[in-house]
């Protein structure tokens, strides 16, 4: 998953906040996400790394110094340096995380509440990641920052914005006012929780009636891979899909079926296990 510099919006359901943290930490340390989330494939997965035709899913050959697959796990090892050679460490990037709607207050990075831009820049001089926003007093959640996202974007290498809500459910459809994608966003990643497939729409989906309408189904119907793809394609709010919680052979088959019906790049895997591969 190529993450361009400046603003990326994260929408959907089933792992947005987890992806926000994973990307922020990788980007800040100059790790895998600094250019790509590389697919971690098992020894039996096909196609192997090095054969992906998708420019957003770089091959092992094209990834250069990026992580490669070693024994089925994500590897960030570099070739052994020559004796006495100076190894240049990757530059630490500055990352701002925020929301355009509301999200739980992060406990894994400094949180700046209603700061000035000078305070944001000062915090970034000592911390690679900062979160910017305001407290929404009725809920205690973090609300959108007062300043424009274009101002925040100018202060950091990366701005990651959680631009959606899903009531902690694995799937969702969007109301007319959703998602709240910043105008400056260069990429929009839609997260899908595969654990919603097989459950009734009424139980697995935020805005179940809207999901059922787009899927040409009833809210009592069980979610199918075809329904998930149909809703994604009907809404067309993203330029990349991340299918999360793919942790079994059956999960992989379901994810592959969804990907086959999508027209945008699709990455599938597990944020918890830190294992992903590009499906299209």
Where are the predicted features?
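Phosphate-binding/switch loop-helix module in NTP-utilizing enzymes
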Residues: 136-173
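Canonical P-loop GTPase G-domain recognition
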Residues: 261-277
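P-loop/Walker-type NTP enzyme "switch/lid" segment
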Residues: 118-151, 202
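N-terminal phosphate/diphosphate-binding loop that engages ATP/GTP or pyrophosphate donors
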Residues: 26-32, 40, 88-131
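G-domain G4 guanine-recognition motif of GTPases
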Residues: 193-194, 218, 240-251, 269-274
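Intrinsically disordered, low-complexity terminal tails and inter-domain linkers enriched
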Residues: 28-93, 126
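Walker A (P-loop) phosphate-binding motif
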Residues: 2-27
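Inter-motif core of Ras-like GTPase G domains
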Residues: 177-196
């Amino acid at each position: 998953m190529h993450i361009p510099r400046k603003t990326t919006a994260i929408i959907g359901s089933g792992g947005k906040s987890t992806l926000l943290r994973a990307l922020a930490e990788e980007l800040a340390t100059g790790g895998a996400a600094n250019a790509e989330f590389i697919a971690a494939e098992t020894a039996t997965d096909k196609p192997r790394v090095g054969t992906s035709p998708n420019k957003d899913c770089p091959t092992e050959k094209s990834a250069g110094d990026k992580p490669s697959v070693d024994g089925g796990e994500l590897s960030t090892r570099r070739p052994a340096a020559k004796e006495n050679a100076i190894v240049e460490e990757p530059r630490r990037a500055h990352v701002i995380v925020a929301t355009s709607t509301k999200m739980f207050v992060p406990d894994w990075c400094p949180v700046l509440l209603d700061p000035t831009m000078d305070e944001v820049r000062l915090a970034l001089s000592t911390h690679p990641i900062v979160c910017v926003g305001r407290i929404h007093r009725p809920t205690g959640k973090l609300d959108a920052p007062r300043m424009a996202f274009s101002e925040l974007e100018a202060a950091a290498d990366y701005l990651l914005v959680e631009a959606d809500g899903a009531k902690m459910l694995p799937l969702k459809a969007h109301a007319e006012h959703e998602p709240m994608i910043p105008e400056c966003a260069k990429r929009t990643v839609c997260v899908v929780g595969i654990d919603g497939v097989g459950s009734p729409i009424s139980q697995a989906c935020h805005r179940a009636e809207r999901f059922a309408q787009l899927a040409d189904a009833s809210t009592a119907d069980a979610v199918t891979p075809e329904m998930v793809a149909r809703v994604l394609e009907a809404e067309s709010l993203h330029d990349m899909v991340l299918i999360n919680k793919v942790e079994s052979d059956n999960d992989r088959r379901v994810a592959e079926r969804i990907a086959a019906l999508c027209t945008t790049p699709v990455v599938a895997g597990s944020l918890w296990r830190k294992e992903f591969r590009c499906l299209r």
